[in-house]
Amino acid sequence: NGINPRSIRNVWGVIKAYETYVGKRGFQPSDPVFDQIQHAGSEFGATTGRVRQCNWISMRHIKQAIDMNGVNNLVVNKLDVLREVEAWKTTDNHFQDEVGFRAYLQNELGNSMGIQKIYFSDNPYNFDEENPLTAAA
């Protein structure tokens, strides 16, 4: 039973544009922008309601996950949160704007890691009138 690994052609990875963590271990130095990201992204644990700690994405961790799982297509979510707080960084780079951030991810992941396509999700509330979402969505 199961699926032959050779029959899987497209492996999709989905990441946030920033990292989050719920728990007791230390995660990052205190920075007001992380509180802004937490608030803008509604970063609370689904079961416990505990506040998620936020940090910049680590390209090392993303590359490791892509390599380990054979990802060849990637979706980057929560760009609207970084857009709201006007902060564009990774753990090792700072960008002037969203264009630079996207170009960096495309170069670092698309070109060097062999990712076929990288999709960047925009504001989830920006839908047309034929497909509205409720405020809770």
Please report, for each region that a protein language model flagged, where it lies by residue.
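Non-transmembrane, aqueous-exposed alpha-helical and coiled segments at domain scale
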Residues: 1-137
